[in-house]
C-alpha cells in the first residue's frame, strides 16, 4: 500500500478511524500512588499501546497539567496528584466518560 493509506482499515490517513475505534474499546483506570519522600504520582493505565500512541498522549497530558511524566509499559505516569481533572482532560482527548474509572 502507499504511504498515504492506513494499513489497518485501508482508508486514506486523513479519513482513518482506527484510533477512534481503539479509544472506544479502552478501559482506563486513573489512580494516585505515593512514592518515596511523600511524592504523589498519577498513574493512568488500561491503554492498548499497539493502537494508541502513548508518547503523544503523554506529551499532551504533561502540557495540560504542566508537570513531568513518563510512559512505562502500557501506563502513563505524571508527577503530582491530577486525579480531579484527569477525567475531563481525557474526555477532551476523545475518550468517553464510561471508559474512565477513578
Curated annotation (Swiss-Prot):
Gene Ontology molecular functions: mRNA binding; translation initiation factor activity
InterPro entries linked: DENR/SUI1_TIF, SUI1, SUI1_arc, SUI1_arc_bac, SUI1_dom_sf
Superkingdom classification of source: Archaea
Keyword terms, alphabetized: Protein biosynthesis, Translation regulation
Pfam entry (one): SUI1
A biological process term (GO) from this entry: regulation of translation
Sequence similarity: Belongs to the SUI1 family.
Entries under PANTHER family matching the protein: DENSITY-REGULATED PROTEIN, DENSITY-REGULATED PROTEIN HOMOLOG
Protein name per UniProt: Protein translation factor SUI1 homolog
Natural source organism: Methanosarcina mazei (strain ATCC BAA-159 / DSM 3647 / Goe1 / Go1 / JCM 11833 / OCM 88) (Methanosarcina frisia)
Record lineage: Archaea, Methanobacteriati, Methanobacteriota, Stenosarchaea group, Methanomicrobia
Amino acid at each position: 500500500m502507499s504511504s498515504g493509506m492506513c494499513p489497518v482499515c485501508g482508508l486514506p490517513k486523513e479519513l482513518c478511524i482506527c484510533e477512534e475505534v481503539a479509544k472506544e474499546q479502552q478501559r482506563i483506570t486513573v489512580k494516585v500512588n505515593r512514592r518515596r519522600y511523600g511524592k504523589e504520582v498519577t498513574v493512568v493505565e488500561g491503554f492498548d499501546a499497539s493502537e494508541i500512541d502513548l508518547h503523544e498522549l503523554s506529551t499532551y497530558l504533561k502540557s495540560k497539567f504542566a508537570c513531568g511524566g513518563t510512559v512505562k509499559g502500557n501506563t502513563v505516569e505524571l508527577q503530582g496528584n491530577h486525579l480531579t481533572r484527569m477525567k475531563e482532560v481525557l474526555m477532551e482527548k476523545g475518550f468517553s466518560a464510561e471508559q474512565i474509572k477513578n
